[in-house]
Amino acid sequence: MRCPSCFHNGTRVLDSRPVDEGRSIRRRRECESCLSRFTTFERVEESPLIVVKKEGTREEFNKEKILRGLIKACEKRPVSLRQLEEVTQSVERELRNLGISEVKSDMIGEIVMEELRDIDDVAYVRFASVYRQFKDLNVFIEELKDILQKERE
């Protein structure tokens, strides 16, 4: 590793720690030439995950979009931001574990709804009503009946 102060190539690692839930390593280094200390981070480079939208357009996966949708669905509900961030991470992990480079937006929506159903039923219905574009009250009622039936099981 090259020293950012004197550009010497010889450095030694003083300390290494896992960070970001083990997805990165933080290393404290010291230059062998000028004794300057600096920090580096090492992480696995992930290939981009492409989302195929309903109309056929493609864009890079953005977990912030999922988080924004979850926050909106959970407004005035007893759900913490931490829980929503965990859902977002879980969704991304599940998508990456599929081992494919392109994923349909429908699949993402279904995974998000399954995760949200376990956290808060009201937030689930809010998210589902937007995601599935409920056209009338009957569709809404059918979704509620489905939730109640699954709770009884």
Swiss-Prot record:
- InterPro entries listed in its UniProt record: ATP-cone_dom, NrdR-like_N, RNR_NrdR-like
User: Which intervals hold domain ATP-cone?
Assistant: 49-139
The protein's GO terms of the molecular function aspect are:
ATP binding; DNA binding; zinc ion binding
Q: Name one Pfam family in it.
A: ATP-cone
Q: Point out which parts of the chain are unnamed zinc fingers, as ranges.
A: 3-34
Report the cofactor remark. Answer: Binds 1 zinc ion.
The answer to keyword DNA-binding applying to this record is: yes
Q: Which GO terms describe its biological process?
A: negative regulation of DNA-templated transcription
Q: Which cofactor does it need?
A: Zn(2+)
Q: Which UniProt keywords apply?
A: ATP-binding, DNA-binding, Metal-binding, Nucleotide-binding, Repressor, Transcription, Transcription regulation, Zinc, Zinc-finger
Per the similarity annotation, which family is this? Belongs to the NrdR family.
Q: Its biological function?
A: Negatively regulates transcription of bacterial ribonucleotide reductase nrd genes and operons by binding to NrdR-boxes.
Q: What is this protein called?
A: Transcriptional repressor NrdR
Q: Where does this protein come from, organism-wise?
A: Bacillus mycoides (strain KBAB4) (Bacillus weihenstephanensis)
The UniProt gene name for this protein comes to: nrdR
